[in-house]
């Protein structure tokens, strides 16, 4: 889960056979104690449906799904590019460019380390 700048709010790494819908609920449940969830989460069509809205409502979160446009060819989807940009940032780091890790907690730690590095670089450019 990322904010509007593409910075990680919280993350979870799971098995490939786990549906993304279950992963979103895991993010809500496994967040650090005291961390507030955003009031609204923007997601793609994989998270649409009443079941997902009810599951998110338990945590006080509204799920808004971004509908795909019917246009042919390459179309930039509103808001969805924010998450895709974060994945592109991760792809620049060798340990996250492929799934090298055997343990999911190591992959998660690498994601957080890369995000810390990116944020420090951004802050140093501001000074």
Report each predicted region and the residues it spans.
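Basic, amphipathic alpha-helical segments enriched in Lys/Arg and hydrophobic/aromatic residues
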Residues: 54-55, 59-63, 73-127
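Polybasic low-complexity intrinsically disordered regions
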Residues: 1-64, 68, 75, 111-115, ...
């Amino acid at each position: 889960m990322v904010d509007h700048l593409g910075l990680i709010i919280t993350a979870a790494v799971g098995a490939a056979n786990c549906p993304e819908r279950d992963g979103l609920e895991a993010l809500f449940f496994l967040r650090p104690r005291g961390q507030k969830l955003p009031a609204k989460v923007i997601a793609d069509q994989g998270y649409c449906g009443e079941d997902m809205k009810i599951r998110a409502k338990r945590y006080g979160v509204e799920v808004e799904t971004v509908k795909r446009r019917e246009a042919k060819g390459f179309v930039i989807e509103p808001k969805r590019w924010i998450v895709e940009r974060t994945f592109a940032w991760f792809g620049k780091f060798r340990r996250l460019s492929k799934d090298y890790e055997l343990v999911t907690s190591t992959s998660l730690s690498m994601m957080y380390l890369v995000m810390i590095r990116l944020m420090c670089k951004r802050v140093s450019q501001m000074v």
